[in-house]
Protein backbone atom coordinates (compact mmCIF):
# COMPACT_ATOMS: atom_id res chain seq x y z
CA UNK A 1 0.00 0.00 0.00
CA UNK A 2 1.32 3.44 -0.96
CA UNK A 3 1.23 6.15 1.68
CA UNK A 4 -0.77 9.18 0.64
CA UNK A 5 -0.20 12.68 2.01
CA UNK A 6 -2.10 15.92 1.73
CA UNK A 7 -1.22 19.50 2.67
CA UNK A 8 -4.46 20.92 4.01
CA UNK A 9 -2.78 23.23 6.51
CA UNK A 10 -0.45 24.60 3.85
CA UNK A 11 -3.22 24.99 1.27
CA UNK A 12 -5.97 26.41 3.48
CA UNK A 13 -4.12 28.55 6.05
CA UNK A 14 -1.45 30.40 4.04
CA UNK A 15 -0.66 33.03 6.68
CA UNK A 16 0.15 30.54 9.42
CA UNK A 17 3.47 29.01 8.39
CA UNK A 18 6.78 29.22 6.60
CA UNK A 19 7.62 26.54 4.04
CA UNK A 20 11.08 25.03 4.54
CA UNK A 21 12.98 21.76 4.55
CA UNK A 22 14.41 19.89 7.55
CA UNK A 23 18.14 20.16 8.24
CA UNK A 24 19.63 16.65 8.60
CA UNK A 25 21.86 15.62 11.48
CA UNK A 26 25.43 14.30 11.32
CA UNK A 27 25.63 10.50 11.06
CA UNK A 28 21.91 10.16 11.79
CA UNK A 29 20.63 6.67 12.53
CA UNK A 30 17.27 5.17 13.40
CA UNK A 31 17.40 3.75 16.94
CA UNK A 32 13.72 2.98 17.61
CA UNK A 33 10.46 2.89 15.75
CA UNK A 34 6.92 2.08 16.77
CA UNK A 35 6.31 -1.19 14.96
CA UNK A 36 2.74 -1.55 16.20
CA UNK A 37 1.72 1.95 15.09
CA UNK A 38 3.57 1.54 11.80
CA UNK A 39 1.55 -1.59 11.04
CA UNK A 40 -1.71 0.16 11.89
CA UNK A 41 -0.84 2.95 9.47
CA UNK A 42 0.34 0.55 6.75
CA UNK A 43 3.80 2.12 6.67
CA UNK A 44 6.08 -0.07 4.51
CA UNK A 45 8.75 -1.86 6.50
CA UNK A 46 11.29 -0.81 3.88
CA UNK A 47 11.11 2.77 5.16
CA UNK A 48 12.66 1.57 8.42
CA UNK A 49 15.53 -0.24 6.69
CA UNK A 50 18.72 1.10 8.27
CA UNK A 51 20.66 0.56 5.03
CA UNK A 52 18.70 3.49 3.60
CA UNK A 53 20.13 5.85 6.21
CA UNK A 54 17.89 7.94 8.43
CA UNK A 55 15.56 8.69 5.52
CA UNK A 56 12.37 10.56 6.26
CA UNK A 57 12.84 9.88 10.00
CA UNK A 58 15.95 12.08 9.99
CA UNK A 59 14.70 14.68 7.53
CA UNK A 60 17.03 13.41 4.80
CA UNK A 61 14.23 12.63 2.35
CA UNK A 62 10.54 13.40 1.91
CA UNK A 63 7.78 11.02 0.92
CA UNK A 64 5.63 11.82 -2.13
CA UNK A 65 2.96 14.38 -1.26
CA UNK A 66 4.78 15.88 1.72
CA UNK A 67 4.97 19.70 1.82
CA UNK A 68 6.92 20.67 4.95
CA UNK A 69 6.06 23.81 6.90
CA UNK A 70 6.91 25.35 10.28
CA UNK A 71 3.81 26.77 11.96
CA UNK A 72 3.63 30.14 13.69
CA UNK A 73 1.76 30.68 16.94
CA UNK A 74 2.06 32.76 20.10
CA UNK A 75 1.14 32.18 23.72
CA UNK A 76 1.17 32.89 27.42
CA UNK A 77 4.09 31.23 29.22
CA UNK A 78 3.87 30.92 33.01
CA UNK A 79 0.92 33.31 32.90
CA UNK A 80 2.75 36.06 31.02
CA UNK A 81 2.19 37.04 27.39
CA UNK A 82 5.27 35.82 25.50
CA UNK A 83 4.40 37.08 22.02
CA UNK A 84 5.31 35.18 18.89
CA UNK A 85 6.60 31.64 19.42
CA UNK A 86 6.02 29.02 16.73
CA UNK A 87 7.70 25.80 15.66
CA UNK A 88 11.23 26.68 16.67
CA UNK A 89 12.60 23.24 15.86
CA UNK A 90 9.66 21.26 14.52
CA UNK A 91 8.39 20.89 10.97
CA UNK A 92 5.01 19.57 9.86
CA UNK A 93 6.08 17.33 6.98
CA UNK A 94 2.59 16.49 5.80
CA UNK A 95 -0.76 15.00 6.70
CA UNK A 96 -1.25 11.31 6.00
CA UNK A 97 -4.59 10.44 4.41
CA UNK A 98 -6.13 7.47 6.22
CA UNK A 99 -8.61 4.96 4.86
CA UNK A 100 -11.53 6.51 6.76
CA UNK A 101 -10.91 9.93 5.22
CA UNK A 102 -9.26 11.43 8.29
CA UNK A 103 -5.68 12.66 8.38
CA UNK A 104 -2.69 12.35 10.68
CA UNK A 105 0.03 14.98 11.03
CA UNK A 106 3.62 13.82 10.61
CA UNK A 107 5.64 16.33 12.62
CA UNK A 108 9.42 16.07 12.80
CA UNK A 109 10.78 17.48 16.07
CA UNK A 110 14.42 18.58 16.18
CA UNK A 111 14.41 19.26 12.43
CA UNK A 112 16.62 22.35 12.50
CA UNK A 113 16.36 26.12 12.51
CA UNK A 114 13.12 27.80 11.46
CA UNK A 115 12.10 31.48 11.32
CA UNK A 116 10.53 30.87 14.76
CA UNK A 117 13.61 29.49 16.52
CA UNK A 118 14.22 32.82 18.31
CA UNK A 119 17.45 32.26 20.29
CA UNK A 120 17.32 28.47 19.93
CA UNK A 121 19.34 26.15 17.71
CA UNK A 122 16.43 24.26 16.17
CA UNK A 123 17.53 20.97 17.68
CA UNK A 124 16.17 18.44 20.14
CA UNK A 125 18.47 16.25 22.21
CA UNK A 126 18.41 12.49 22.60
CA UNK A 127 17.39 12.75 26.26
CA UNK A 128 14.22 14.75 25.67
CA UNK A 129 13.35 12.84 22.52
CA UNK A 130 13.43 9.54 24.39
CA UNK A 131 11.35 11.02 27.21
CA UNK A 132 8.66 12.24 24.82
CA UNK A 133 8.50 8.95 22.95
CA UNK A 134 8.08 7.02 26.19
CA UNK A 135 5.58 9.43 27.71
CA UNK A 136 3.30 9.74 24.71
CA UNK A 137 3.16 5.98 24.24
CA UNK A 138 2.63 5.39 27.96
CA UNK A 139 -0.30 7.82 27.93
CA UNK A 140 -1.78 6.18 24.85
CA UNK A 141 -1.81 2.75 26.45
CA UNK A 142 -3.31 4.25 29.61
CA UNK A 143 -6.18 5.37 27.37
CA UNK A 144 -5.45 9.10 27.63
CA UNK A 145 -5.69 11.33 24.51
CA UNK A 146 -2.19 12.15 23.32
CA UNK A 147 0.13 12.70 20.43
CA UNK A 148 1.99 9.54 19.36
CA UNK A 149 5.65 8.72 18.77
CA UNK A 150 6.59 6.91 15.57
CA UNK A 151 10.40 6.99 15.49
CA UNK A 152 13.61 8.29 17.05
CA UNK A 153 16.77 9.15 15.17
CA UNK A 154 20.05 9.67 17.06
CA UNK A 155 23.14 11.40 15.70
CA UNK A 156 26.66 12.66 16.32
CA UNK A 157 25.62 16.32 16.08
CA UNK A 158 26.73 18.11 19.28
CA UNK A 159 24.02 20.20 20.96
CA UNK A 160 24.71 22.47 23.92
CA UNK A 161 22.22 22.52 26.78
CA UNK A 162 23.24 22.56 30.47
CA UNK A 163 25.93 20.18 29.23
CA UNK A 164 26.89 19.09 25.74
CA UNK A 165 24.49 16.47 24.40
CA UNK A 166 23.75 14.98 20.99
CA UNK A 167 20.98 15.93 18.59
CA UNK A 168 18.05 13.67 17.82
CA UNK A 169 14.75 13.77 15.95
CA UNK A 170 11.33 12.48 16.91
CA UNK A 171 8.57 11.77 14.41
CA UNK A 172 5.44 12.82 16.27
CA UNK A 173 1.97 11.97 14.98
CA UNK A 174 -1.30 13.66 15.89
CA UNK A 175 -4.72 14.22 14.40
CA UNK A 176 -3.80 17.89 14.58
CA UNK A 177 -1.13 20.15 16.05
CA UNK A 178 -3.54 23.09 16.30
CA UNK A 179 -2.93 24.89 19.60
CA UNK A 180 -4.59 27.58 21.66
CA UNK A 181 -1.57 29.67 20.71
CA UNK A 182 -2.48 29.65 17.02
CA UNK A 183 -5.60 31.66 17.83
CA UNK A 184 -3.78 33.95 20.24
CA UNK A 185 -1.20 34.82 17.60
CA UNK A 186 -3.67 36.40 15.20
CA UNK A 187 -5.90 37.88 17.89
CA UNK A 188 -3.03 39.91 19.33
CA UNK A 189 -1.99 40.89 15.81
CA UNK A 190 -5.50 42.33 15.45
CA UNK A 191 -6.38 39.98 12.62
CA UNK A 192 -9.73 38.54 13.78
CA UNK A 193 -10.55 37.27 10.29
CA UNK A 194 -7.59 34.88 10.55
CA UNK A 195 -8.73 33.72 13.99
CA UNK A 196 -12.07 32.89 12.39
CA UNK A 197 -10.32 31.09 9.53
CA UNK A 198 -8.59 28.87 12.10
CA UNK A 199 -11.94 28.08 13.71
CA UNK A 200 -13.44 27.35 10.29
CA UNK A 201 -10.54 24.99 9.52
CA UNK A 202 -11.03 23.14 12.81
CA UNK A 203 -14.78 22.78 12.30
CA UNK A 204 -14.45 21.78 8.64
CA UNK A 205 -11.97 19.01 9.31
CA UNK A 206 -12.64 17.83 12.88
CA UNK A 207 -16.30 18.72 13.51
CA UNK A 208 -17.84 18.69 10.02
CA UNK A 209 -21.30 17.94 11.44
CA UNK A 210 -21.51 21.57 12.57
CA UNK A 211 -20.43 23.30 9.35
CA UNK A 212 -23.94 24.37 8.38
CA UNK A 213 -25.24 25.02 11.91
CA UNK A 214 -25.92 28.65 12.84
CA UNK A 215 -24.29 28.29 16.27
CA UNK A 216 -21.33 26.31 14.95
CA UNK A 217 -18.66 28.44 16.62
CA UNK A 218 -20.28 28.29 20.06
CA UNK A 219 -20.82 24.52 19.74
CA UNK A 220 -17.23 24.07 18.65
CA UNK A 221 -15.78 26.02 21.58
CA UNK A 222 -18.02 24.12 24.00
CA UNK A 223 -16.55 20.89 22.68
CA UNK A 224 -12.99 22.22 22.96
CA UNK A 225 -13.72 23.14 26.58
CA UNK A 226 -15.31 19.76 27.33
CA UNK A 227 -12.44 17.83 25.78
CA UNK A 228 -9.99 19.88 27.81
CA UNK A 229 -11.95 19.13 30.97
CA UNK A 230 -11.98 15.40 30.31
CA UNK A 231 -8.26 15.43 29.51
CA UNK A 232 -7.34 17.18 32.76
CA UNK A 233 -9.55 14.76 34.68
CA UNK A 234 -7.62 11.87 33.13
CA UNK A 235 -4.31 13.47 34.10
CA UNK A 236 -5.40 13.91 37.70
CA UNK A 237 -6.67 10.35 38.08
CA UNK A 238 -3.40 8.74 36.94
CA UNK A 239 -1.20 11.23 38.80
CA UNK A 240 0.25 12.88 35.69
CA UNK A 241 1.88 16.30 35.99
CA UNK A 242 2.49 18.01 32.64
CA UNK A 243 4.93 20.55 34.02
CA UNK A 244 4.59 23.36 31.48
CA UNK A 245 0.95 24.11 30.67
CA UNK A 246 1.58 27.24 28.63
CA UNK A 247 -1.21 28.17 26.22
CA UNK A 248 0.97 27.19 23.27
CA UNK A 249 1.15 23.69 24.75
CA UNK A 250 -2.64 23.25 24.80
CA UNK A 251 -4.31 21.22 22.04
CA UNK A 252 -7.59 22.28 20.42
CA UNK A 253 -8.47 18.57 20.17
CA UNK A 254 -7.85 17.88 23.85
CA UNK A 255 -4.64 15.92 23.32
CA UNK A 256 -1.69 15.75 25.67
CA UNK A 257 1.05 17.49 23.71
CA UNK A 258 4.61 18.74 24.23
CA UNK A 259 6.08 16.44 26.85
CA UNK A 260 8.84 18.31 28.62
CA UNK A 261 9.29 18.43 32.41
CA UNK A 262 6.44 15.98 33.02
CA UNK A 263 6.26 13.46 35.82
CA UNK A 264 3.96 10.86 37.30
CA UNK A 265 3.47 11.06 41.04
CA UNK A 266 5.63 8.72 43.07
CA UNK A 267 4.73 9.62 46.65
CA UNK A 268 1.28 11.20 46.77
CA UNK A 269 1.97 14.92 46.96
CA UNK A 270 -0.81 17.15 45.60
CA UNK A 271 1.62 20.07 45.46
CA UNK A 272 4.12 18.14 43.34
CA UNK A 273 6.13 20.39 40.98
CA UNK A 274 7.66 18.41 38.14
CA UNK A 275 9.48 21.32 36.50
CA UNK A 276 12.42 22.62 38.52
CA UNK A 277 12.14 25.90 36.57
CA UNK A 278 8.62 26.47 37.92
CA UNK A 279 9.75 28.39 40.99
CA UNK A 280 6.26 29.70 41.86
CA UNK A 281 4.60 26.31 41.44
CA UNK A 282 2.16 27.59 38.84
CA UNK A 283 2.00 24.20 37.14
CA UNK A 284 2.04 22.02 40.25
CA UNK A 285 -0.09 18.89 40.12
CA UNK A 286 -3.11 20.17 42.07
CA UNK A 287 -3.20 23.45 40.13
CA UNK A 288 -3.60 21.84 36.70
CA UNK A 289 -7.42 22.07 36.62
CA UNK A 290 -7.42 25.81 37.37
CA UNK A 291 -4.58 26.48 34.91
CA UNK A 292 -6.47 24.70 32.14
CA UNK A 293 -9.49 26.92 32.84
CA UNK A 294 -7.26 30.02 32.76
CA UNK A 295 -5.87 28.87 29.41
CA UNK A 296 -9.39 28.34 28.06
CA UNK A 297 -10.27 31.86 29.16
CA UNK A 298 -7.32 33.15 27.11
CA UNK A 299 -8.61 31.18 24.12
CA UNK A 300 -12.14 32.48 24.70
CA UNK A 301 -10.83 36.03 24.56
CA UNK A 302 -9.54 35.43 21.03
CA UNK A 303 -13.01 34.28 19.93
CA UNK A 304 -14.94 37.35 21.11
CA UNK A 305 -15.10 38.85 17.59
CA UNK A 306 -17.47 36.08 16.46
CA UNK A 307 -18.84 34.31 19.58
CA UNK A 308 -21.07 36.12 22.07
CA UNK A 309 -19.83 36.50 25.64
CA UNK A 310 -22.74 34.49 27.08
CA UNK A 311 -21.94 31.58 24.77
CA UNK A 312 -18.28 31.71 25.73
CA UNK A 313 -19.17 31.67 29.42
CA UNK A 314 -21.48 28.69 28.89
CA UNK A 315 -18.60 26.86 27.25
CA UNK A 316 -16.30 27.64 30.17
CA UNK A 317 -18.97 26.26 32.49
CA UNK A 318 -18.96 23.16 30.31
CA UNK A 319 -15.27 22.74 31.09
CA UNK A 320 -16.00 22.64 34.82
CA UNK A 321 -18.87 20.20 34.32
CA UNK A 322 -16.82 17.88 32.12
CA UNK A 323 -13.85 17.99 34.49
CA UNK A 324 -15.83 17.24 37.64
CA UNK A 325 -18.10 14.66 36.02
CA UNK A 326 -15.29 12.73 34.37
CA UNK A 327 -13.02 12.95 37.39
CA UNK A 328 -15.79 11.70 39.66
CA UNK A 329 -16.57 8.79 37.36
CA UNK A 330 -12.93 7.80 37.06
CA UNK A 331 -12.22 8.00 40.78
CA UNK A 332 -15.30 5.95 41.63
CA UNK A 333 -14.04 3.34 39.17
CA UNK A 334 -10.63 3.43 40.83
CA UNK A 335 -12.32 2.76 44.18
CA UNK A 336 -14.49 -0.01 42.75
CA UNK A 337 -17.81 1.84 43.02
CA UNK A 338 -20.48 1.17 40.42
CA UNK A 339 -22.88 3.81 41.74
CA UNK A 340 -22.55 7.37 43.00
CA UNK A 341 -23.29 8.20 46.63
CA UNK A 342 -23.12 11.50 48.48
CA UNK A 343 -20.27 10.55 50.82
CA UNK A 344 -17.94 9.24 48.09
CA UNK A 345 -15.90 12.45 47.86
CA UNK A 346 -15.37 12.52 51.61
CA UNK A 347 -14.18 8.91 51.58
CA UNK A 348 -11.77 9.63 48.74
CA UNK A 349 -10.43 12.76 50.41
CA UNK A 350 -9.85 10.84 53.64
CA UNK A 351 -7.74 8.36 51.70
CA UNK A 352 -5.81 11.17 50.02
CA UNK A 353 -5.13 12.80 53.40
CA UNK A 354 -3.85 9.52 54.79
CA UNK A 355 -1.67 8.95 51.71
CA UNK A 356 -0.23 12.47 51.91
CA UNK A 357 0.66 12.06 55.60
CA UNK A 358 2.33 8.72 54.98
CA UNK A 359 4.00 9.54 51.66
CA UNK A 360 2.17 6.63 50.05
CA UNK A 361 2.99 5.75 46.48
CA UNK A 362 0.06 6.97 44.35
CA UNK A 363 0.08 4.29 41.66
CA UNK A 364 0.90 1.35 43.93
CA UNK A 365 -1.69 2.31 46.56
CA UNK A 366 -4.59 2.20 44.12
CA UNK A 367 -3.25 -0.90 42.39
CA UNK A 368 -2.93 -2.72 45.71
CA UNK A 369 -6.40 -1.54 46.70
CA UNK A 370 -7.72 -3.21 43.55
CA UNK A 371 -6.41 -6.55 44.85
CA UNK A 372 -7.82 -6.12 48.35
CA UNK A 373 -10.66 -8.37 49.51
CA UNK A 374 -13.43 -6.53 51.28
CA UNK A 375 -13.83 -9.26 53.88
CA UNK A 376 -10.44 -8.58 55.43
CA UNK A 377 -8.43 -5.45 56.19
CA UNK A 378 -5.32 -7.62 56.45
CA UNK A 379 -3.54 -7.05 53.16
CA UNK A 380 -0.22 -6.01 51.62
CA UNK A 381 -1.73 -2.52 51.27
CA UNK A 382 -2.32 -2.25 55.01
CA UNK A 383 1.29 -3.19 55.60
CA UNK A 384 2.47 -0.13 53.65
CA UNK A 385 0.95 2.24 56.22
CA UNK A 386 2.70 3.21 59.42
CA UNK A 387 -0.49 4.42 61.08
CA UNK A 388 -2.38 1.13 60.87
CA UNK A 389 -5.17 2.38 63.12
CA UNK A 390 -5.90 5.27 60.74
CA UNK A 391 -5.86 2.93 57.77
CA UNK A 392 -8.12 0.42 59.53
CA UNK A 393 -10.61 3.17 60.37
CA UNK A 394 -10.69 4.31 56.76
CA UNK A 395 -10.90 0.76 55.44
CA UNK A 396 -13.87 0.01 57.69
CA UNK A 397 -15.74 2.94 56.12
CA UNK A 398 -14.60 1.87 52.65
CA UNK A 399 -15.75 -1.70 53.26
CA UNK A 400 -19.13 -0.46 54.46
CA UNK A 401 -19.46 1.55 51.26
CA UNK A 402 -18.59 -1.50 49.15
CA UNK A 403 -21.35 -3.47 50.86
CA UNK A 404 -23.91 -1.03 49.42
CA UNK A 405 -23.00 -2.27 45.93
CA UNK A 406 -24.66 -5.41 44.63
CA UNK A 407 -21.37 -6.57 43.15
CA UNK A 408 -19.15 -9.44 44.20
CA UNK A 409 -15.47 -9.00 44.99
CA UNK A 410 -14.20 -10.63 41.80
CA UNK A 411 -16.12 -8.29 39.50
CA UNK A 412 -15.15 -5.26 41.56
CA UNK A 413 -11.49 -6.23 41.47
CA UNK A 414 -11.63 -6.76 37.71
CA UNK A 415 -13.06 -3.28 37.19
CA UNK A 416 -10.50 -1.68 39.47
CA UNK A 417 -7.61 -3.47 37.79
CA UNK A 418 -8.75 -2.12 34.41
CA UNK A 419 -8.42 1.49 35.58
CA UNK A 420 -5.66 1.36 38.21
CA UNK A 421 -2.38 0.84 36.35
CA UNK A 422 0.37 -1.32 37.76
CA UNK A 423 2.94 0.62 35.76
CA UNK A 424 3.39 4.27 34.85
CA UNK A 425 6.39 6.01 33.32
CA UNK A 426 8.29 7.03 36.41
CA UNK A 427 11.09 9.50 35.73
CA UNK A 428 13.73 7.12 37.00
CA UNK A 429 12.67 4.44 34.51
CA UNK A 430 12.97 6.94 31.67
CA UNK A 431 16.35 8.11 32.98
CA UNK A 432 17.70 4.56 33.10
CA UNK A 433 16.79 4.08 29.44
CA UNK A 434 18.31 7.46 28.56
CA UNK A 435 21.58 6.73 30.37
CA UNK A 436 21.97 3.46 28.47
CA UNK A 437 21.02 5.01 25.13
CA UNK A 438 23.56 7.79 25.56
CA UNK A 439 26.18 5.02 25.84
CA UNK A 440 24.90 3.42 22.64
CA UNK A 441 22.81 0.67 24.29
CA UNK A 442 19.20 0.84 23.08
CA UNK A 443 18.03 -2.39 24.71
CA UNK A 444 16.44 -0.72 27.74
CA UNK A 445 14.67 1.85 25.54
CA UNK A 446 13.06 -0.95 23.53
CA UNK A 447 12.30 -3.01 26.64
CA UNK A 448 10.66 -0.08 28.44
CA UNK A 449 8.49 0.70 25.44
CA UNK A 450 7.27 -2.90 25.48
CA UNK A 451 6.53 -2.77 29.22
CA UNK A 452 4.54 0.46 28.86
CA UNK A 453 2.25 -1.20 26.33
CA UNK A 454 0.75 -3.29 29.15
CA UNK A 455 0.24 -0.86 32.03
CA UNK A 456 -2.57 -2.86 33.62
CA UNK A 457 -0.58 -6.10 33.87
CA UNK A 458 0.93 -6.88 37.26
CA UNK A 459 4.68 -7.39 37.39
CA UNK A 460 7.03 -8.39 40.18
CA UNK A 461 10.08 -6.59 38.80
CA UNK A 462 11.34 -3.04 39.25
CA UNK A 463 9.14 -1.59 36.50
CA UNK A 464 6.27 -1.72 39.00
CA UNK A 465 8.26 -0.86 42.12
CA UNK A 466 8.73 2.37 44.02
CA UNK A 467 11.69 4.41 42.79
CA UNK A 468 15.12 3.95 44.35
CA UNK A 469 16.40 6.86 46.41
CA UNK A 470 18.33 8.37 43.50
CA UNK A 471 15.18 8.16 41.38
CA UNK A 472 13.22 10.34 43.81
CA UNK A 473 15.62 13.25 43.40
CA UNK A 474 15.64 13.59 39.62
CA UNK A 475 15.17 17.14 38.37
CA UNK A 476 13.62 17.85 35.00
CA UNK A 477 13.23 21.18 33.26
CA UNK A 478 12.09 22.75 30.00
CA UNK A 479 15.57 22.17 28.57
CA UNK A 480 15.20 19.83 25.62
Swiss-Prot record:
MF-aspect GO terms: AMPylase activity; ATP binding; magnesium ion binding
Record-listed E.C. numbers: 2.7.7.-, 2.7.7.108
Keyword rRNA-binding in record: no
Superkingdom of this protein's organism: Bacteria
Required co-factors: Mg(2+); Mn(2+)
Binding site for ATP: 86, 88-89, 109, 121-122, 172, 179, 258
One protein family per Pfam: SelO
Transmembrane helix as UniProt keyword: no
Keywords of this entry: ATP-binding, Magnesium, Manganese, Metal-binding, Nucleotide-binding, Nucleotidyltransferase, Transferase
UniProt-listed InterPro entries: adnlytase_SelO, SelO
Catalytic activity: L-seryl-[protein] + ATP = 3-O-(5'-adenylyl)-L-seryl-[protein] + diphosphate; L-threonyl-[protein] + ATP = 3-O-(5'-adenylyl)-L-threonyl-[protein] + diphosphate; L-tyrosyl-[protein] + ATP = O-(5'-adenylyl)-L-tyrosyl-[protein] + diphosphate; L-histidyl-[protein] + UTP = N(tele)-(5'-uridylyl)-L-histidyl-[protein] + diphosphate
Positions of the catalytic residues: 248 (proton acceptor)
Ligand binding (Mg(2+)): 249, 258
Disulphide-bridged cysteine pairs: none
Family as reported in the entry's similarity comment: Belongs to the SELO family.
General function of this protein: Nucleotidyltransferase involved in the post-translational modification of proteins. It can catalyze the addition of adenosine monophosphate (AMP) or uridine monophosphate (UMP) to a protein, resulting in modifications known as AMPylation and UMPylation.
Protein name: Protein nucleotidyltransferase YdiU
Natural source organism: Salmonella typhi
Gene: ydiU
Amino acid sequence: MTLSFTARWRDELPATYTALLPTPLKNARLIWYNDELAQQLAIPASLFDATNGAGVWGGETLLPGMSPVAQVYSGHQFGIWAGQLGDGRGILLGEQLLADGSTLDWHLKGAGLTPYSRMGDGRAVLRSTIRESLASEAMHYLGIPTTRALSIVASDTPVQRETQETGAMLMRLAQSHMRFGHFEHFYYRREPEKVQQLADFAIRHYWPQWQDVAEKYALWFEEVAARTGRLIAEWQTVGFSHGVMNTDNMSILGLTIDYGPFGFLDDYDPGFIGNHSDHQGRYRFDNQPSVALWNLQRLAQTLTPFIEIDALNRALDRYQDALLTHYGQRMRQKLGFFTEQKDDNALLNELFSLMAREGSDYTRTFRMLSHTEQQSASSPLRDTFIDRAAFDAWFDRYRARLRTEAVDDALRQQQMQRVNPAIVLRNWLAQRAIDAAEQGDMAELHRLHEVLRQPFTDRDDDYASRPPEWGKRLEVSCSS
